Amino acid sequence: MLLLAAVAASIALGSRAIPLRGVYDALTCPDGWPLTCAADGSTAQIVRELRLPRTGLALVCGLALGMAGALIQGYTRNPLADAGLLGINAGAAFLAALSIHLLALTTPAQYIWFAFAGALLAGVAVFGVSSVGGGKASPLSLVLAGAAITAFLQAMTNVVVLLDGTALNTYRYWVVGDVAGHDPSVFQQVLPFLIIGLLLALAAGPGLNLLGLGDDVARGLGVNIARNRALGLAAIVLLAGAATAAVGPIAFLGLIVPHLARAWTGPDYRWLLPYSGLVGAITLLIADTLGRLIARPGELQAGVTLAAIGAPFFILLVRRRKLVSL
């Protein structure tokens, strides 16, 4: 019910409030029948062409980032981990900025594939570097490799944006993180990757429960540790990479959402993963809607709104409750 309420509010509220009856008519009435509908032509255009694609993008990206955050915290055993820890955000940012600089791309629909490729390559690089030497990617080696690759990619991104003022202007809008102003094709481009990532994440849940007992115990119970970690990292890269490429790095979402979901489901990842996706979708929808209402008739980007709300909330969460050991 809360998800439906968040979706309805996202479509109905903004610089111009639309009654729910008007939203319903705009979605259901065929063109050419204005006399029988409460929605006029401009209302139908706002709902169908602006708010509905925006709401859909927020829904799927919030779901993806929430599930990716739960997976990252589980595999790294770090309750403060998110997509930035594995270099995914930095990889997406670097290739997005580089493509803007070299190819003069200006819209998210144009550079989304480069951002996704950057996230994918960064995730593979982190997994590869963390596996060097011991032959397996332990939680500690994943964190260290992610930190090193993130620092390198951030430095390269800074070089690109400082060399090109146009790239800086386009990049700084994307890097804030927002679901507004995206062509509907962006939703269609990322949806297949998000679906595949969702299925991989759900498949990785049972094995992740056993990995939480320790590698030796999990191995004794018959878990193929390398295969399970590879499955989980593939899900993380697809979910977080596609969502970040589409809307930019959304701060705090992948960090806070798993803790909220864990309060309802407990540590069982078979339930934690879908609930994290549900809470992530609701959270991003609410943040986007609040951003439209707070600065009306303008708006605040969802990334700014979520950071402003999420930072004090997370501090309160840490002070009132001890973080669950992962």
Question: Model-predicted segments: where are they?
Answer:
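Alpha-helical transmembrane segments in inner-membrane proteins
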Residues: 1-326
